[in-house]
Amino acid sequence: MDVLYPRCAGLDVHKATVVACIRLALANGQAATEVRTFGTTTAGLLALAAWLAENGCTHVAMEATGVYWKPVWHILADDEVTLVLANAAHVKNVPGRKTDVSDALWLAELLAHGLVRPSFVPEPETQVLRALLRTRKQLGREKASHVQRLQKTLEDANIKLDAVVTNLLGVSGRAMLEGLVEGESDPGKLAKLAHPRLTATPERVQEALRGRVTRHHRFLLRLHLDQIDALDAAVARIDAEVNGNLASFHAAIGLLTSIPGVSKLAAQVIVAEIGIDMGRFPTAGHLLSWAGLCPRNDESAGKRRSQRLRKGASWLKTTLVQCAWAGSRKKAGYLQAQFHRLRGRRGPKKAICAVAASILTATYHMLKNGTSYQDLGPDHFKRRSKQAQAQRLLRRLADLGYAVEVTSVAAASA
């Protein structure tokens, strides 16, 4: 097998150590290897970089192991060396022969022959935006957990507040919760704290607030409300920081928000996950495959065993699915037509994944060509398959016992 990179290295990265193996091709066709272990402190990683430069390494491969690879990547990226991040599932060694040294040697061997498929690593400024928005999403999940605990505490006290308000943290819900925390137990007085435009009647509100609230319930309610307020404040700080890092992304975000269902926040997340340089993905299909929005390849003996979606980029996929649900509810649009066309025969889950794939495909071409979104229209599928639709209707009429002769409107009027 041809050697593409005669001077390369493989790194087996751990929390405290990095096992590095240099592979140098010799004139006789053999290869010389040298293995060293370095610490993951800054001094240790700088020593690793100096050792690689001293041996003239041009390419370095490492596995994507949690977050441990990132400090190594950032320090080695400052040197004139090509870094390759490998998916651990793609470079597995022979079972039963796994050691740190053998892993590093195996990575170096695969890299030398060009057998390591590089994973997508965005530019540094995109990585900053990605870290901020992923943290924002995690804080949102934590807030949702505290809201659920809030509801559980209210149920324990037999307060059915969520039955009369749509949002516990809305104007009416928050006012009545604060009243409960402050020690008010009279349902009539608590009901008067609700906003006048609350749809539930005062009698229903009073009945929902008639419970058994004890001291520990008030303590837990106050605790969860304080946590929710703290998380809201943290999200606001992240939003301010994100806005300060959007200088080079404003044009791309403006384009993406023209897609039905894609909000400004969703556009920011999409840009943070895939970047704005679509040259990293040869085609839209490559981007869909990386995101996990296309069927997997699982064939044996000429039979397709599974067509389930791969896990892919979960941070991106969840956002795209949310956008797809929003887009499928936009009237008189292509995305809604696509969803309803597929839902009847494939089910809503597969249909919404197809809509998400359409949004990502449009995103790819918009960012690559700098064009705005052009909706194909709700009648796109009817226009595209007019003849097939006519034949299908004729077969249906024939099944019902009718013989029909078809003449086009233009020919009949001529």
Give, region by region, the residue ranges found by the protein language model:
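A detector of single, family-specific signature residues
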Residues: M1-A414
